């Protein structure tokens, strides 16, 4: 926010130079992001009165003027300004003057006629186009007759325009929205300087005509906890007096008209946005605060017709929506030069709805910013009354009797306690009760002190203070951060290390990268259609109240949705061979709004295209189920899980291929799944044949692990035997391997499947599998009797469990 130091001086006796004041504010309150004087380096610019205007003899668009600039003789100026006229009071940049941007103005000739300077527009003095009044966009600045009567030719124009003011640009933090007003800033500077601010006062004179006879209003408390209207009749809408325009443009706001400018002045003074309606153009005299109807449209003050969204708060008259509440007014009831009767609105609106409407309509205004961050609830009606009084004063209006109040509430000031002992414990100081009392006095906080405990009643203007820590902060910053004693950290130092879960996550990433997968990081938020895909957990995704886009509305329930988007991105750019993994959290809610959602650590991976490229020796190896299964098995082996890993075929996962998908169990615990992405799902994500897995790392972390140890390497030779069996075609190889391991006894060291055969000499409903069995004894050399006994146990178990035939 821009802060005028001259305006602050109306509140406080500030003797400090602006740069020292800025330093104190930065050290105590908020950062001063910039400091400047609008007149920067400009000089020799004065008030002048146009004495005569004659056409230029050699130009159809320029004129020759004689102006009184307070010197002995008139000064001749040649100008092309279309709005120059005799009798006007204007701004003159004299010979050897410097205007905005460092441009020097010198005496010269224009089409043969001498010009001793330049009549200037505000933009030529450095005014932004967004601040300069619209009436003078195409010409020079002309003072109105009322203001001109108080000006003297030759007077310093930069001073008259308020350009010798010092302006501070404050970086207001979210918790200090009270500084979005000059009153709030004055209270803060008063505390810094140990002064008492003198806030603006006003006198309101009302007519006998009652406001309630002219207008009515309704407002639900959940949309507008405060809402009131006032009526001012018989106003004359015209340019504001110079003092008011000067205040506005110094603060970066364009003057529009006396009525609108007063509402903007109240916004700057109190931090309370107000709005003015043309009473005579209201479709109905019944004003209502409500939410927008489906497809309801409003033509706003910028001339754009906008469609309101569900949940937007609108102000309606009868059945017609007039404006987006707290964001921007409507063209239908705009105050214009023809307006004679106005309705003033003062309100507090629900902040979330204002934020949603401002973002949805891309209408971030000074008003919406303040409603979003909060306003002083005790100033709403004060600002409304002050605006009515000032409009009556400068626009000649009559204020009708009373406010029409649709909604109000009694504010209960929060009471917060803090002890001197606690303050000193937190800050490491030895501050006394008297010093803390002095700080609360500087802040103008009411308090009671009882045996070292302060009971503080927080004023409404400081709604950021709600807990003990807030009071400690107030004490610290006004005591002076530089005055806090410097102390070294106490306590024993400990070596930094990863927690067990962090170590597991880091090892997972390392292993997957070693197995050929590249890490991807995708968005946590996704579409409602994708949020439920590939879910490993029962629960619901979480819907954002105000999503930033249609593609980022809900939290993900699986990492695979983002990974498939990443695959699609790569495939669309001619990168067909993709192997990616992501480690991150998924979010699961049980539907209870009073409980936080579960955040569960997962890891997922996808492969598509070729996992190995073509070489001179052999062709490319295409991605398939078994390539990915090998990656997952290696990863799980590195976790040293105490129980066996099982891959159980499943058809229950709708997004996965029903014949090429398996759930992954460790013991009886489901930890994930693996398989081919269903062709229809792949088509929806715009990817080719893709294989994927997802694991629950939190579940894996909680599983029992094998303790670190070592296995003796036998110095005796191993013995290998091959075993070929014939079984039904639907018997899983993993089940056969499990039976072999269980029946093989302690001597069986390793089992490897090395051949699967179907075809000639094998029945259509059968398949032949060949296993390589390795036997080892660490204590002696194996003999045939030992091995034969183990093989007989294995063949008997296979025949018994699977009706297997030994080939």
Where does each model-flagged region fall?
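Phosphate-backbone binding interfaces of nucleic-acid-interacting proteins
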Residues: 1-203, 376-377, 383
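A carboxyl-terminal module marker
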Residues: 2, 27, 442-445, 612, ...
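Glycine/proline-enriched, intrinsically flexible loops and inter-domain linkers
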Residues: 5, 55, 63, 198-296, ...
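Beta-rich nucleic-acid/ligand-interaction surfaces
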Residues: 40-43, 206, 493, 498, ...
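Conserved mixed alpha/beta core segments that line enzyme active sites in large multi-domain catalysts
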Residues: 47-78, 257, 266-334
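Class II aminoacyl-tRNA synthetase-like tRNA-binding/catalytic domains
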Residues: 71, 108, 288-328, 332-335, ...
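Mobile "lid/hinge" segments at catalytic clefts and subdomain interfaces of large enzymes
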Residues: 115-128, 135, 315-411, 570, ...
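Extended, well-folded interaction surfaces typified by the phenylalanyl-tRNA synthetase beta subunit core
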Residues: 416, 420, 424-576, 774-776, ...
């Amino acid at each position: 926010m821009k802060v005028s130091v001259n305006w602050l001086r109306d509140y406080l006796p500030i003797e400090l130079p602006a740069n020292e004041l800025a330093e104190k504010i930065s050290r105590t309150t908020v950062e001063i992001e910039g400091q400047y004087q609008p007149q920067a380096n400009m000089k020799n610019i004065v008030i002048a009165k146009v004495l005569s205007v004659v056409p230029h003899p050699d130009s159809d668009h320029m004129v020759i003027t004689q102006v009184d600039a307070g010197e002995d003789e008139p000064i001749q100026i040649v100008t092309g300004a279309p709005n120059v006229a005799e009798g006007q009071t204007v701004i003159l940049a004299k010979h050897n003057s410097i205007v905005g941007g460092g441009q020097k103005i010198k005496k010269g000739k224009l089409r043969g006629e001498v010009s001793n300077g330049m009549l200037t527009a505000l933009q030529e003095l450095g005014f932004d186009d967004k601040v300069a009044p619209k009436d003078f966009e195409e010409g020079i600045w002309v003072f109105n007759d009322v203001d001109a009567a108080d000006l003297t030719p030759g007077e310093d124009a930069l001073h008259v325009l308020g350009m010798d003011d010092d302006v501070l640009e404050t970086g207001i933090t979210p918790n200090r929205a009270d500084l979005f007003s000059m009153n709030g800033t004055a209270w803060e500077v008063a505390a810094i300087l140990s002064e008492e601010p003198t806030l603006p006062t006003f006198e309101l004179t009302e007519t006998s005509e009652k406001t309630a006879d002219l207008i009515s209003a309704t407002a639900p408390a959940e949309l507008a906890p405060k809402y009131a209207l006032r009526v001012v009749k018989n106003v004359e809408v015209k340019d504001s007096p110079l003092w008011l325009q000067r205040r506005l443009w110094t603060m970066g706001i364009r003057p529009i008209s006396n009525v609108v400018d007063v509402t903007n002045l109240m916004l700057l003074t109190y931090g309370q946005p107000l709005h003015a309606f043309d009473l005579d153009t209201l479709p109905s005299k019944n004003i209502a605060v409500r939410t927008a109807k489906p497809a309801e449209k409003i033509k706003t003050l910028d001339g754009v017709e906008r469609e309101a969204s569900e949940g937007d708060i609108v102000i309606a008259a009868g059945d017609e929506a007039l404006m987006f509440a707290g964001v921007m007014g409507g063209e239908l009831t705009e105050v214009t030069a023809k307006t004679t009767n106005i309705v003033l609105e003062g309100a507090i609106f629900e902040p979330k709805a204002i934020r949603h409407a401002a973002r949805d309509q891309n209408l971030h205004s000074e008003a919406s910013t303040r409603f979003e961050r909060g306003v002083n609830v005790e100033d709403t009606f004060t600002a409304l009354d002050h605006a009515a009084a000032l409009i009556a004063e400068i626009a000649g209006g009559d204020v009708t009797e009373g406010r029409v109040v649709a909604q109000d509430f009694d504010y209960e000031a929060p009471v917060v306690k803090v002890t001197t002992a606690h303050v000193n414990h937190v800050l490491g100081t030895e501050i006394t009760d008297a010093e803390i009392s002095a700080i609360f006095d500087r802040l103008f906080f009411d308090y009671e002190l009882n045996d070292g405990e302060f009971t503080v009643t927080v004023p409404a203007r400081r709604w950021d203070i709600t807990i003990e820590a807030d009071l400690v902060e107030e004490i610290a910053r006004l005591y002076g951060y530089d005055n806090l004693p410097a102390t070294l950290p106490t306590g024993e130092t400990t070596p930094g290390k990863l927690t067990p879960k962090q170590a597991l996550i880091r090892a997972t990433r390392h292993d997957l990268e070693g197995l050929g997968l590249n890490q991807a990081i995708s968005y946590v938020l996704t579409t409602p259609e994708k949020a439920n895909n590939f879910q490993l957990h029962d629960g619901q995704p979480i819907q954002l109240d105000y999503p930033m886009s249609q593609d980022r509305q809900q939290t993900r329930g699986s990492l695979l949705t983002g990974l498939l988007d990443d695959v699609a991105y790569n495939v669309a750019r001619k990168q067909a061979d993709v192997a990616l993994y992501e480690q991150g959290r998924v979010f699961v809610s049980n539907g209870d709004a009073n409980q936080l959602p579960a955040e569960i650590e997962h890891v997922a991976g996808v492969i598509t295209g070729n996992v190995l490229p073509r070489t001179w020796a052999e062709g490319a190896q295409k991605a398939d189920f078994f390539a990915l299964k090998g990656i997952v098995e290696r990863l799980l082996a590195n976790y040293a899980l105490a129980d066996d890993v099982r891959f159980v075929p499943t058809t229950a996962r709708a997004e996965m291929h029903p014949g090429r998908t398996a759930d992954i169990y460790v013991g009886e615990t489901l930890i994930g799944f693996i398989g081919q992405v269903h062709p229809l799902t792949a088509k929806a994500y715009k990817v080719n044949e893709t294989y994927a897995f997802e694991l629950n790392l939190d579940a894996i972390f909680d599983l029992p692990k094998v303790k670190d140890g070592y296995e003796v390497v036998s110095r005796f030779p191993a013995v290998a035997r091959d075993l070929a069996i014939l079984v039904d075609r639907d018997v899983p190889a993993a089940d056969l391997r499990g039976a072999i391991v269980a029946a093989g006894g302690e001597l069986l060291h390793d089992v490897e499947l090395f051949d699967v055969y179907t075809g000639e000499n094998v029945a259509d409903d059968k398949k032949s599998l060949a296993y390589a069995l390795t036997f080892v004894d660490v204590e002696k050399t194996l003999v045939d009797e030992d091995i034969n006994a183990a093989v007989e146990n294995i063949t008997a178990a296979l025949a018994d469990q699977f009706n297997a035939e030994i080939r």
